[in-house]
């Protein structure tokens, strides 16, 4: 096992419903350490840049509109195998297919408004974390 850092975003649908605290508590209860946190609103251009890997996918424009529709909460979590374990905590992309007790099952509305985003690989985390946080903003 190795200690990793991963990015998690609380998406606009969950922020609108004031679920940030519940989501943070849920992840902390699983033993992860919160090392960075900020609330912000992405512009459409920033959302397009962040999700550039999905540029050719049919849902790209709708995703970017949604992610820039309201405030989000960006977080960096640290822990043993954080990337894969936090993806398990988040659950399947589609809340209807997510396991009971996962964040998306608990708080997601549909496949688009599924409450949270998380880095899907070490390579993604290395790109996604610095998109939102400088080294000075990450507390050991």
From Swiss-Prot:
Major role in the synthesis of nucleoside triphosphates other than ATP. The ATP gamma phosphate is transferred to the NDP beta phosphate via a ping-pong mechanism, using a phosphorylated active-site intermediate. SUPFAM superfamilies: Nucleoside diphosphate kinase, NDK. This is Nucleoside diphosphate kinase. The keyword Metal-binding applies. Gene3D superfamilies: Nucleoside diphosphate kinase-like domain (3.30.70.141). Keywords: ATP-binding, Cytoplasm, Kinase, Magnesium, Metal-binding, Nucleotide metabolism, Nucleotide-binding, Phosphoprotein, Transferase. It comes from the Bacteria. InterPro entries: NDK-like_dom, NDK-like_dom_sf, Nucleoside_diP_kinase, Nucleoside_diP_kinase_AS.
